[in-house]
């Protein structure tokens, strides 16, 4: 019995039985990215080919949209803290549905496309922190990793299937595609309106003891670690396409992406308990080592290297992204929604830095005729930058903690992988 308590429940025992609202929320975690990825991955092609925008303008629009979608999560978390989780998800879906309807109208009035795209990204920014917080609301500590992993698996499944369904129709029948996605989001919005609220728990009840600023109570180490993880991972996300298509084909690039999605869908739920119990320092070491190994393997440029590198990078980010979220929840005194919003901001900052700095480095490698060096340099950063987190960890550990408020503090056993109740 003692061993079972230490190891925690298995995946099946953690997830089941599922209540009706949680079943619907997990289904929505699949349907929402399914609809979104029927459209968003093709926006550069749609804006350029169908609406005639210049590539420079397209790049600026997509960069602005990505920044809103990631970094706006901190506003979504704060809004959920103020008006409640269900209301925030509902308003976010209304905004996002309006965005997809706007894309349909943009076929008649092209300038509307930019604002419609921004609306969809604003909706995503508002929705995700509240969605994650609702998913783990009232769930005991040992089951939280399983629920977060199941939500991530559903999200990645939707991201994988959406482009496969929509690819043939983006340029040939975009009107029908946008109408179908808008209808899907309308249905999901109606379903969310029927979810039970969590406001009875008083989402703002901690305001008297916790400052209400957007970054107040941030768990600094998981925040910085998340920004660094996304910075390094997005070297792969941003630049694999041009590298893989050049050395293999666009079809093979799709195979690599499908492998990565499949690994997240299958491995993260199964490994969630192990990741929860893993000491934080060990999880960071394992995750960044996986990223380093995968990025280094990509430098070979062969088809086998693309598959192996993608797999190693995905396994590394499975550990890093989940563990950083769990540690942020454990260390911060803020509500779950605010914590997820803060972590989303960190992800946005990291992804943005990767696009700016990584783009310059990849351009240098391309001009020199040795783009393989780009991946080796990225791998070296995976080994050289994470040790700087140790300095931050020691500095945070020395910070005094007021009596009676130790939940977000670093303690002597802060790496035991526990996710305390909130």
Where are these regions (language model features)?
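Helix-to-loop junctions at the C-terminal end of transmembrane segments
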Residues: 72-84, 170, 266-280, 362
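Cytoplasmic helix-loop-helix junction between adjacent transmembrane helices
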Residues: 117-155
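A membrane-interface helix-boundary motif in multi-pass transporters
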Residues: 170-183, 360-382
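Juxtamembrane intracellular "pre-TM" segments in multi-pass secondary transporters
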Residues: 2-19, 197-228, 407-411
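A late C-terminal transmembrane helix in Major Facilitator Superfamily
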Residues: 337-366
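Helix-loop boundary and gating motifs at the non-cytosolic
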Residues: 16-66, 219-256
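C-terminal membrane-cytosol helix-exit motif in multi-pass small-molecule transporters
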Residues: 183-201, 388-392
């Amino acid at each position: 019995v003692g061993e079972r308590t230490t190891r925690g429940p298995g995946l099946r025992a953690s997830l089941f039985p599922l209540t009706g609202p949680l079943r619907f929320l997990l289904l929505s975690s699949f349907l929402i990215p399914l609809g979104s990825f029927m459209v968003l991955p093709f926006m550069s092609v749609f804006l350029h080919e169908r609406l005639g925008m210049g590539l420079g303008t397209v790049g600026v629009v997509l960069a602005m949209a990505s920044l809103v979608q990631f970094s706006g999560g901190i506003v979504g978390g704060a809004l959920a803290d103020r008006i409640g989780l269900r209301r925030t998800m509902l308003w976010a879906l209304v905004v996002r549905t309006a965005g997809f309807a706007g894309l349909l109208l943009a076929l008649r009035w092209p300038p509307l496309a930019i604002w419609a795209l921004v609306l969809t990204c604003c909706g995503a920014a508002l929705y995700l922190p509240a969605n994650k917080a609702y998913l783990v609301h009232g769930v005991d500590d040992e089951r939280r990793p399983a629920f977060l992993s199941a939500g991530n698996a559903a999200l990645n499944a939707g991201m994988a299937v959406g482009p496969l369904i929509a690819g043939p129709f983006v340029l040939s029948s975009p009107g029908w595609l946008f109408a179908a996605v808008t209808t899907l989001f309308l249905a999901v919005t109606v379903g969310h309106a029927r979810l039970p609220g969590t406001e009875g728990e008083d989402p703002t009840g901690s305001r008297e003891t916790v400052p209400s600023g957007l970054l107040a109570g941030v768990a600094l180490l998981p925040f910085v670690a998340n920004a660094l993880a996304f910075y390094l991972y997005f070297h792969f996300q941003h630049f694999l396409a041009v590298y893989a298509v050049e050395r293999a084909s666009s079809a093979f690039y799709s195979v690599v992406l499908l492998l990565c999605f499949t690994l997240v869908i299958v491995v993260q739920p199964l490994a969630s308990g192990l990741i929860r119990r893993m000491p934080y320092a060990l999880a960071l070491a394992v995750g960044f080592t996986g990223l380093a190994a995968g990025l280094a393997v990509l430098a070979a440029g062969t088809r086998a290297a693309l598959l192996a590198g993608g797999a190693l990078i995905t396994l590394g980010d499975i550990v890093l992204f989940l563990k950083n979220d769990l540690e942020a929840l454990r260390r911060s005194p803020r509500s779950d929604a605010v914590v997820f919003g803060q972590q989303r901001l960190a992800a946005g900052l990291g992804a943005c830095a990767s696009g700016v700095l990584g783009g310059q480095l990849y351009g240098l490698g391309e001009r020199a005729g040795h783009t393989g060096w780009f991946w080796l340099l990225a791998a070296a950063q995976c080994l050289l930058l994470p040790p700087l987190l140790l300095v931050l960890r020691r500095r945070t550990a020395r910070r005094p903690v007021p009596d009676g408020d130790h939940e977000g503090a670093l303690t002597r056993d802060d790496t035991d992988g526990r996710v305390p109740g909130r």
